[in-house]
């Protein structure tokens, strides 16, 4: 039987794990928090989520067969998923706010060589535009010149990082500057008995 964990806290030498089916006590906890895809927080993003806007190329790529797809980001996920999405899309635009990518050079080189990909650097997406039912285009802006343009596309895949899902831990666990829990090589945290994978 599955239970939803609501809170994890240290209680003396034990941990108190509160769930939707009651409280559990244990001597150690292995916590696998994962993360939530970061959003662009722009007009139209929420409205067209699932109607053109996606955060998972593997999950949703096939819905864009022979369509124009856009990808936002500059890291490994954005670069690798842009290449993956060329299996489906007639064209893939990769939009990145900087001139240089943070992704591995090998992945970027493969992307540059792909004839179905057009890379647009120094740009951000300002708005997702649709017809009320589905996404139809993006409004993008050059971050150096402030020049705006519209890009016709029916898909937007957002790969701009993850927000760590660490809200269940109520004790002061050490985190890095991005909010991810810090562990040693044994996956131990600063709280004895709390392991993070």
Model-derived features: positions:
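N-terminal Rossmann-fold NAD(P) dinucleotide-binding loop
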Residues: 78
């Amino acid at each position: 039987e599955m239970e939803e964990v609501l809170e994890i806290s240290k209680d003396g030498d034990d941990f108190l794990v509160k769930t939707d089916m009651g409280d559990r006590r244990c001597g150690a906890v292995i916590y696998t928090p994962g993360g939530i895809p970061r959003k662009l927080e722009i007009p139209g993003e929420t409205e067209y989520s699932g109607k053109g806007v996606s955060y998972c190329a593997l999950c949703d790529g096939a819905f864009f067969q022979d369509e124009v797809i856009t990808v936002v980001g500059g890291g490994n996920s954005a670069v690798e998923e842009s290449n993956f999405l060329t299996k489906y899309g007639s064209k893939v635009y990769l939009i990145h706010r900087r001139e240089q990518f943070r992704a591995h050079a090998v992945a970027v080189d493969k992307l540059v060589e792909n004839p179905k990909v057009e890379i647009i650097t120094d740009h951000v997406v300002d708005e997702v535009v649709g017809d009320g039912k589905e996404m139809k285009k993006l409004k993008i802006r050059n971050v150096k010149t402030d020049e705006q343009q519209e890009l016709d596309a029916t898909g937007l895949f957002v790969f701009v990082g993850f927000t760590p899902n660490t809200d269940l831990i109520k004790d002061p666990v050490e985190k890095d500057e991005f909010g991810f829990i810090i562990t040693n090589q044994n996956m131990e945290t600063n709280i004895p008995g709390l392991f993070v994978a």
